[in-house]
Regions:
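Short, well-ordered beta-strand elements
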Residues: 6-17, 56, 66-69, 119-120, ...
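N-terminal lobe/hinge region of extracytoplasmic solute-binding protein
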Residues: 12-60, 93
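Aromatic- and charge-enriched surface segment that lines or borders ligand/interaction sites
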Residues: 25, 57-100
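Short helices/loops that flank or line small-molecule/ion binding pockets
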Residues: 80, 190-203, 308-317
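Surface-exposed binding/hinge segments that line
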Residues: 101-145, 153-158
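Ligand-site clamp/hinge motif
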Residues: 171-213
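Periplasmic-binding protein-like
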Residues: 223, 235-277
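Ligand/substrate-recognition segments at binding pockets and active sites
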Residues: 282-320
Length: 320
């Protein structure tokens, strides 16, 4: 709690790229865009099907060439202004000027404000994925004049190289978040190998001035379970069975049991998700690994230990 405000602070390992309409390269930036901006539709968390967002519902003509999106009447921008259909229309036209979005909505012939509370899409050809496309983060709508002002559950109040702060939007049109503020503390030095940052003690957050650091007392601390995915980039240099051999080496060779880290700090998982178990393949002996592989990873120091042991194990298989 900060000033009677429930606040979540997230130490983050890299500076965040500026938010802008359309496609964003980083997953963190994509997630932030989804919290700051809203689209005409959104994906239901349970079914992953598009449902109403800025539009409470929509209708499609029998030939599939006309889509009418009916807007909610209580929409407000983060600056308090009421949302008008003309605002959304302007921003949609701006998005269609972006090459990637122009391809995403290549079926759209034109967009019109056919009623003060209705936006209508006229299509060149039927596109029954239109509601899905509009639910994507890259199709979310910012104010046409202020690209960092949206209608999402959080509004952006600070964006610097060291701190990104979001505060809840009091006039949000859907269910309000429990948190009033979220802060990304950009602290890349804490995640460098030379700092010795461990997953047991990733970061300490202290509220106050630097000269008060010696007098502060701990309020709370804890360790929560985490996970780490190993993804294998599809390439002509790495066959399916070669990829399976790498996975099998990690899970079945006893490599994890030989790591010089705390007991049970790194263990093999048996499923990616509940009910989605990792298969155990019997890799044929004739399967040989490529001569070289590149492993990319970040934080914490336990993963450096893991990477070094994996490197030595793969080297014994003829892979550097």
């Amino acid at each position: 709690w900060q000033n009677d405000t429930p606040t979540l602070r997230i130490p983050y390992y890299r500076p965040l790229e500026p938010l802008q309409p359309g496609f964003l390269p980083g997953r963190a930036e994509q997630h932030l865009a989804g919290q700051i901006f809203s689209g005409l539709t959104r994906f239901d968390n349970n079914t992953q099907r598009p449902i109403g967002d800025l539009a409470h519902h929509w209708e499609t003509s029998t030939d599939g060439l006309r889509w009418d999106f009916y807007l909610r009447s209580t929409l407000h921008w983060h600056n308090g202004d009421a949302v008008k259909a003309s605002h959304l229309h302007q921003r949609l036209l701006m998005l269609l000027q972006l090459p990637a979005l122009d391809q995403l909505f290549i079926s759209v012939k034109r967009i019109e404000v056919t009623h003060p509370q209705c936006l209508t899409f006229f299509l060149h050809r039927p596109d029954y994925w239109l509601a899905h496309r509009l639910a994507s983060y890259c199709s979310h709508l910012a104010h046409p004049q202020f690209p960092l002002i949206g209608t999402g559950p959080f509004r952006l109040t600070q964006f610097t190289a060291e701190l990104v702060r979001l505060e809840s939007h009091d006039y949000y049109h859907l269910r309000h978040p429990l948190l009033k503020a979220v802060e990304y503390w950009i602290t890349p030095p804490l995640f460098e190998k030379d700092m010795g940052t461990s997953c047991r003690h990733p970061v300490q957050i202290t509220i106050g001035k630097p000269e008060e650091l010696q007098r502060v007392s701990q309020v709370s601390s804890g360790i929560s379970l985490g996970f780490c995915y190993l993804t294998l980039r599809k390439s002509l240099r790495l066959s399916l069975w070669q990829a399976r051999k790498v996975i099998s080496i990690i899970h079945q060779s006893g490599l994890l049991q030989t790591l010089e880290v705390g007991e049970n700090l790194i263990t093999a998982s048996h499923a990616l998700l509940p009910g989605w178990t990792i298969p155990h393949w019997q890799v044929p002996d004739e399967v040989k690994l490529p001569k070289t592989l590149t492993l990319v990873y970040h934080l914490p120091i336990e993963l450096h230990t893991m990477a070094e042991r994996l490197q030595a194990t793969l080297a014994a298989e003829g892979c550097e």
